[in-house]
Amino acid sequence: MKAPDVRCDVLVIGGGAAGIAAAIAAGRAGARTVLLERYGFLGGLASAAWVGTICGLYLRDTAGAEAVPVSGGFAQEFAARLQKMSGAKPMRVESGLWVLPYQPVNFAQVADAMAGEEKNVTVVLHATVAEAQAQNGRLQRVRALAWNEPLAISPAAVVDCTGEATAAALAGAPAEDGGTDQATALVFVLENVDPALAQRGLLEVRRELRRAVENKILPPICERLSLIPGSAVQGRMAFKLSLFPATPGRPLWEQVTNWERESRALLEPLRKFLAENVPACREARLHSVAPQLGVRSGRRVLGRARLADADVLGVKKSPQGIARGAWPMERWTSSPRPEMTYFAERDYYDIPLDCLRAKELDNVFVAGRCLSAETGAMTSARVIGTALATGWAAGTAAAFQAAGKAMEAAIKETRKDLGRTECKL
């Protein structure tokens, strides 16, 4: 079957938080934009893995009574739309960190609505990239399957928001494997849970789970259970079961397949134990399970610059800064709780545009988990709020390059957007 040849100014691959922002930014800049997404809905892991909270939108503040946005611009516009649809409000969780809770279906609905409002953006769902061809230092063509029909796209510029730098790597861009850096997680929802459990926290649950593990009633992984903040609605609560990091040297596809199957198999024994030993869960039933695991790390492109751990911890500012990071380093390892490394309160670090530009492919930009960063820095910059910001910056830069404009102009435009406080509702 001959693939139709589609020409566009900007091709965005991956419709998660970064990809949505990149496509809308490029479209608003006047670029004919195509957005490819492998699922039948937008939102990426925010929709498919049921992350449940948007981190990175607000400054850390242990004393303040209200959440303070780290910047204006598209990230806050998206958050405002999500709040308007769901009624969600920012909440402080611990150590002065603020998050915006959300329902996964609302995230996908807002993404659909906002992308659909852009006349220059064409969304292609159920689309999987199969090949990326580069020549003379530029990505020239991408071949994909869209609902099992071949599609060939010739873009002027590309934004890789796949979370795994898939297109950039297929085209030969140098990258580093971050797939073993952090543990994955499975989110599931229990119904008929006493709402008081959300107020009391999980101390009682964790005590019982520790006993179950010590007595070999449940496997050790069950101690890694946590409650998703703000998820308690009408007797339903979303829980996160953090798995273990990948084993270096073994194929990731093999490990991910095993994690998906084995973690789901744990849910009924876990639910049964909670029902028998935790009064608040006595009538609990398994309501639903996220369609896929939440993956916290993946392959990262080597960019023209690299966000360093020291840049994050030292809240370094840059005249080339096009996004702001406000979330601490959050490393999920084999420990039951994450290792948090904080920087100064009420402050942020800049992410320079060159961290979003592939080193050896002139027309390839990256955003979200694909950006060029050291391992520790990525544990901060990977969160949804920051991904919305880096996606917007990458989409703007790609549109400017496709139009023959200088990157300095793209930086200026993006920095102006960071100061934008009004939101299109």
Walk through the language-model features, giving the residues of each.
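Beta1/beta-strand and adjacent pyrophosphate-binding region of the FAD-binding site
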Residues: 4-16
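Membrane-embedded transmembrane-helix bundle of lipid-linked glycan/lipid transferases
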Residues: 11-13, 22, 137
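N-terminal Rossmann-fold NAD(P) dinucleotide-binding loop
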Residues: 19
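Conserved N-terminal/central alpha/beta ligand/cofactor-binding core
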Residues: 25, 31-32, 37-127, 131
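Flavin (FAD/FMN)-binding glycine-rich loop and adjacent Rossmann-like elements that form
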Residues: 45, 126, 149-157, 161-424
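Conserved beta-strand-loop-beta-strand element in the redox core of flavoprotein oxidoreductases
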Residues: 133-152
